[in-house]
Design a protein with these regions (language model features):
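Metallo-beta-lactamase
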Residues: 2-52, 100-118
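Catalytic core of the metallo-beta-lactamase
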Residues: 29-83
Length: 147
């Protein structure tokens, strides 16, 4: 499991705060998990880079995925839930240990990465973007739709 060290430490902290934020020790304290910890941006596999975007959680990470045939995506995940977060550079609603401005800076970071590489920045939970992206990739890349 690839994670930022700050995320694991927060999840294992034993304080009441993580559970108050719906982060449960049981999800982290499992001897079967082979933790691969990072402290900042790091390539975790060829063409896949974890990008530290702390704010939503202390060790939140987004991902840059470069496709073998060219192009790629920057997946914001919970750093930017909706297109509106990206367009307006507005923080997500839930933040742990970060200000709205710090979270907005993470969105700007992802926008810079996407612009520098010419990649599409994909929000984490946008109900319009994800179905459209799935449909586009199904048609253009020959992906098979699930039954």
């Amino acid at each position: 499991m690839h994670a930022q060290r700050a995320e694991l430490e927060y999840g294992l902290s034993g304080s009441a705060e993580p559970e108050a934020n719906d982060i449960f020790r049981i999800d982290f304290d499992d001897p079967r998990i082979d933790w691969r910890l990072a402290e900042g941006d790091t390539e975790i596999a060829p063409g896949v880079t974890a990008v530290l975007t702390a704010g939503h959680t202390p060790g939140h990470q987004s991902f840059v995925v470069s496709r073998a045939g060219g192009g790629g995506f920057v997946f914001a995940f919970d750093a930017a839930d909706l297109s509106e977060n990206i367009e307006r550079e507005v923080s997500v609603g839930t933040r742990i240990g970060a200000s709205a401005e710090q979270c907005a800076e993470q969105i700007r970071k992802l926008k810079r990465i996407a612009a520098q590489r010419g990649y599409r920045l994909v929000p984490g939970h946008d109900p319009v973007v994800w179905p459209a992206l799935t449909a586009e990739l199904t048609v253009t890349r020959g992906l098979v739709k699930p039954p």
